[in-house]
Amino acid sequence: MRALGFIGIILSIFSSFAYASEAKLDTGNTAWMLVASALVVFMTVPGLALFYGGLDKSKSILNTIAMSFSAFAVVTLTWIFVGYSVAYGDDIFGFIGNPFQYVLGKGISGINSDTGYPALLDLMFQLTFATITTALISGSFVGRMKFSAWILFAILWSVFVYPPVAHWVWGGGFLANDGALDFAGGTVVHINAGIAGLVGALILGRRKDTSLIPNNVPLVALGAGILWFGWFGFNAGSALGANESAAWAMINTTVATSTAALAWMFTEWLHVGKPTVVGISSGIVAGLVAITPAAGFVNLIGSIFIGAIASVCAYFMVALVKPKFGYDDALDVFGIHGVRGIVGAVLTGVFADPNVGGTPGLLYGNPKQVLIQIEGVIATILYSAILTAVILLVLKAVVGLRVSEEEELELDSSLHGEKAYNL
């Protein structure tokens, strides 16, 4: 009996070790990350699709919406097959993750001990970032790109461009090791997409009619509102839990976005004499983009400055610089996402508050952080520009990129066999 009792004690000790090693489900974090993932899906379909659709011409609104919807569907599959592995697999020379590690969810199971939610949920949350980043690029291409070429571009770009940059910053790559700060995707999402959009606009060439006359301003405003709402999942969700960091990200997102909307409105009012709803909506997106890299790193004063500075810079890029140089970035993806992403990323290195995110920026005695941020900006610009150009030039040679001039006149009818408004 004594022997049995001794064995029981030994087994209970080992059993306690086993239970101690098992991560426990944090239901609060799990619930929040499920909601955050759904919010980012809502940003893309329908938020981005409606925002872009309202900005575009009536003859191609359906094509514009289809580009966002199809990008989400296509990238969902590329992400679970290879994208997640490249972004978050075991590091290879600081550049990519093991591309075979998590194919179709292989090896993703159990509870993440760091976050307390199922590891599979991270696959879903990060999927939403990959999908919206690819969809963002479509705004530069609308009005003249073959739909088949767009599908092929979305496949290739979501495999060869987005995942490596995500790995550099969030997957243990060289920028992460250097200490680059990007809370929710200033470099990974917005600079990456903005530069790809600019390169694509240059390679595709100008449309026959390059005027920006929105076909449905209320749709633009509705899309901007949905983007703002969904962005809470984007930024606050990047805290990876229901915690103080998420609260900082949410309030900073609100403050920067409000500041940016006002900055754009008053700048436009002074410049052209009237504040427009499209301008206010663009200012909203300006603030959302600019605060993305800084959301969990800066205090409220920092978020005000970031929102205002980025919005004014983006306004002059869209209103003055683009017309002067004549490139046809149809819906201002470079001006809205590229420029604001760059400004936001650099200013994160200026305003980062150690009392918020643990890392000091220039104003808190760490000027080196600005240089690290600039390193991330330059690396992303170069990589995105070169790889995007290669992908588009290959597609141009193999399948062609542009529709015919006749198809461009009535793009929805020629590519999709339908019209948005049957009046």
Curated annotation (Swiss-Prot):
Domain of life where this protein originates: Bacteria
Listed transmembrane segments: 31-51, 64-84, 123-143, 150-170, 183-203, 217-237, 246-266, 278-298, 301-321, 331-351, 374-394
MF terms in GO: ammonium channel activity
GO BP: ammonium transmembrane transport
Name of the protein: Ammonium transporter
Signal peptide: 1-20
GO cellular component: plasma membrane
Stored InterPro entries: Ammonium/urea_transptr, Ammonium_transpt, Ammonium_transpt_CS, NH4_transpt_AmtB-like_dom
Physiological role: Involved in the uptake of ammonium/ammonia (NH(4)(+)/NH(3)).
Subunit structure: Homotrimer.
Compartments reported by the entry: Cell membrane
Sorted UniProt keywords: Ammonia transport, Cell membrane, Membrane, Signal, Transmembrane, Transmembrane helix, Transport
Topology relative to the membrane: Multi-pass membrane protein
SUPFAM superfamilies given in the database record: Ammonium transporter
Family (UniProt): Belongs to the ammonia transporter channel (TC 1.A.11.2) family.
Main localization category: membrane
